[in-house]
UniProtKB/Swiss-Prot annotation:
CDD domains (alphabetical): Lumazine_synthase-I (cd09209)
Species the sequence originates in: Blochmanniella pennsylvanica (strain BPEN)
Keywords: Riboflavin biosynthesis, Transferase
Classification via SUPFAM superfamilies: Lumazine synthase
Name of the coding gene: ribH
Catalytic residues as annotated in Swiss-Prot or TrEMBL: 89 (proton donor)
Reaction(s) catalysed by this chain's protein: (2S)-2-hydroxy-3-oxobutyl phosphate + 5-amino-6-(D-ribitylamino)uracil = 6,7-dimethyl-8-(1-D-ribityl)lumazine + phosphate + 2 H2O + H(+)
Family: Belongs to the DMRL synthase family.
Protein name as annotated: 6,7-dimethyl-8-ribityllumazine synthase
Length: 158
């Protein structure tokens, strides 16, 4: 039986982080969580991290596709917040963003960390972007680091 698993150190990895400007005060916390994990746990150097600010969550799949086809990055982290309103706009944006990022990841065999918060209210968004715990940006960064290493192991195994 073969078991493949990996750690989260990827000190030579090149990472792009796409961050949504809308709800920036929440997304700044997600970004800080992702950067903390990349540097402290993944040992990723500043010069290997690119941050791209986009207008809204709906734009995340497009920028992720552009980053993927550039072949400059080993992984992408998508960060944003969609808060439920009184229209179906929330469901539309969340679904399109989620399915778009998943499709791009699979089509390009490229890890994309899903750090898109979908919450009922601002309190939930603040809680899930916590500085000390429950930061979904941190979780997305950890997933990307591990998947970068797992994909390398699979590629290099015979």
């Amino acid at each position: 039986m073969n078991i493949i698993e990996s750690d989260t150190i990827a000190n030579k990895a090149k990472i792009a982080i796409a961050v949504v400007r809308f709800n920036r005060f929440v997304n700044n916390n997600l970004l800080e969580g992702a950067l903390d994990v990349l540097k402290r746990i993944g040992h990723v150097k500043d010069e290997n991290i690119t941050i791209i600010w986009v207008p809204g969550s709906y734009e995340l799949p497009l920028i992720a596709k552009a980053l993927a086809i550039s072949h400059k990055y080993d992984g992408i982290i998508a960060l944003g917040t969609v808060i439920r309103g009184f229209t179906i706009h929330f469901e539309f944006v969340a679904k399109e963003c989620s399915s778009g990022l998943s499709r791009i990841s699979m089509e390009n065999t490229l890890p994309i960390g899903f750090g898109l918060l979908t919450t009922d209210n601002i309190s939930q968004a603040i809680e899930r972007s916590g500085i000390k715990a429950n930061n979904k940006g941190s979780e997305a960064a950890l997933a990307v680091l591990e998947m970068i290493n797992i994909l390398k192991i699979i590629k290099n195994s015979s």
